[in-house]
């Protein structure tokens, strides 16, 4: 289904109204309620801050899940520090040699659900089944019971100060791949500022797309993390796990953190499908504890990459891994994680640029189209969570993507612009060291500028989602 679509005008207004009302209600309720006597969860109790949960850690250390999580799968400040230490608390239980032989640090996660997806201004045959009847604009709607993909996540320590993650993950048909797989050497030279890992891992984004509280078809990804302008052949996504090596470090409480990663230019794909190039990702963040309000964190990041524009060929067929004519791109910006009692605010801004050859899909050994230039855009979002208690969370998010310069000057300046809205409720009837269950309900809507019929069309995609997100 095309990414940006619409329905009839009445249906369009209705779906947008529902999304807007839910999002605004969540945000306004949070703002109003957060002014009450704060039950602020700090790094030392049921803190409100951010990873994928693994109940095996709670079993291993005899801790409640709330010791590391605001609302599973988000980590709080204590959970962030636990992860930064290589899934270690600094006691005798860190090394697996002290564990019962029957202990296996593994978690399964899946979400049976009921959802409805709708997309406007989709190109369909005027007469179904007749490819010669011409194309007309229609709204496509699907609904029914479904399954999510499945994560089989295991992580922990191979030995003291040697940690690992292995995450085989499948789509909802059962087709598996490795979402993450790495080994990390912690506290090298007895120094918490020197940790080194190699493998496939999530970029050290302050706001993690792998651990956030949205699951629907339109709300379950950050638009700005994956946006590319029309005609761009770059494959990079800031939310995609990458393959490479990372040097990182942190203060004792992980309030100050840095990361430097050297990555293959493959966007996380195995078998070196593109070229022999490398990308770099740099992050730096600092947090302060402001007492009853919580822990406030601000971070900066920069991703500097290159992608090939053409390949060596054999009898006209591209040879994998021989990409050349590399051209640069970058993503830079700021992100925050701020608490006001039980209200959490997550702002994010990004400036992005892709070289003209990438943005126009032109091989570097031929001339650019007349007037071609680098594509540039800005994106951002504001996400809000209100934690009524450790078992009930209201969520809301607004996102925007705005082109500042099209690679092709003949294109409308706003082609590809995005506005996205999401809101939802997440209730945890159970969450303990053996298993967790969340009833997740969400509504999301995305408006994209430009359709198959006109560059000035506004195309809407909407999602209504309710599911049982469980792990054990």
Regions found by a protein language model. Give the residues of each.
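Outer membrane beta-barrel
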Residues: 76-77, 108-127, 137-268, 274-292, ...
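Local sequence-structure signature of Cys/Sec-based thiol-disulfide redox active-site neighborhoods
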Residues: 52-64
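The canonical Cys-X-X-Cys-His
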Residues: 62-72
């Amino acid at each position: 289904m095309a990414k940006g679509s619409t329905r009839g005008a009445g249906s369009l207004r209705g779906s947008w109204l529902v999304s807007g009302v839910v999002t605004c209600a969540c945000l306004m309720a949070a703002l109003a309620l957060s002014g009450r006597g704060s039950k602020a969860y700090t790094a030392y109790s049921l803190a409100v801050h951010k990873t994928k949960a693994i109940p095996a850690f709670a079993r291993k250390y005899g801790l409640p899940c709330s010791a590391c999580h605001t609302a599973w799968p988000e980590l709080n400040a204590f959970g962030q520090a636990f992860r930064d230490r290589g899934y270690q608390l600094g006691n005798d239980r860190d090394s697996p040699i002290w564990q019962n032989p029957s202990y296996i640090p593994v978690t399964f996660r899946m979400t049976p659900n009921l959802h409805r997806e709708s997309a406007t201004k989709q190109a369909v045959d005027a007469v179904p089944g007749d490819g010669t009847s011409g194309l007309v604009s229609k709204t496509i709607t699907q609904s029914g019971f479904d399954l999510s993909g499945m994560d089989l996540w295991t992580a922990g320590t191979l030995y003291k100060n040697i940690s690992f993650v292995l995450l085989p993950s499948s789509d909802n048909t059962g087709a598996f791949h490795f979402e993450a797989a790495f080994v990390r050497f912690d506290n090298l030279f007895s120094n918490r500022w020197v940790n080194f890992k190699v493998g496939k891992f999530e970029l050290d984004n302050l706001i993690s797309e792998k651990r956030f509280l949205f699951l629907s078809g339109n709300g379950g990804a950050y638009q700005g993390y994956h946006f590319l302008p029309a005609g761009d052949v770059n494959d990079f996504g800031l939310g995609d796990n990458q393959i490479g090596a990372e040097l990182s470090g942190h203060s004792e409480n992980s309030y100050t953190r840095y990361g430097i990663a050297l990555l293959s230019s493959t966007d996380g794909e195995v078998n070196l499908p593109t070229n022999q190039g490398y990308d770099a990702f740099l992050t730096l963040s600092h947090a302060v504890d402001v007492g009853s309000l919580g822990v406030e964190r601000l971070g900066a990041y920069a991703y500097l990459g290159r992608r090939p524009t053409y390949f060596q060929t054999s009898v006209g067929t591209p040879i994998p891994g021989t990409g050349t004519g590399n051209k640069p791109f970058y993503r830079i910006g700021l992100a925050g994680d701020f608490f006001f009692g039980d209200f959490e605010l997550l702002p994010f801004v990004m400036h992005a640029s892709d070289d003209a050859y990438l943005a126009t899909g032109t091989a570097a050994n031929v001339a650019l189209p007349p007037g071609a230039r680098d594509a540039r855009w800005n994106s951002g979002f504001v996400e809000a969570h209100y934690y009524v208690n450790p078992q009930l969370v209201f969520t809301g998010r607004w996102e925007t993507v705005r082109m500042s310069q099209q690679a092709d000057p003949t294109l409308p300046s706003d082609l590809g612009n995005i506005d996205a809205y999401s809101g939802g409720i997440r209730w945890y009837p159970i969450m303990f060291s053996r298993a967790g269950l969340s009833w997740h309900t969400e509504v999301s809507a995305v408006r994209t500028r430009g359709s198959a019929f006109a560059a000035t069309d506004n195309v809407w995609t909407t999602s209504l989602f309710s599911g049982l997100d469980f792990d054990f």
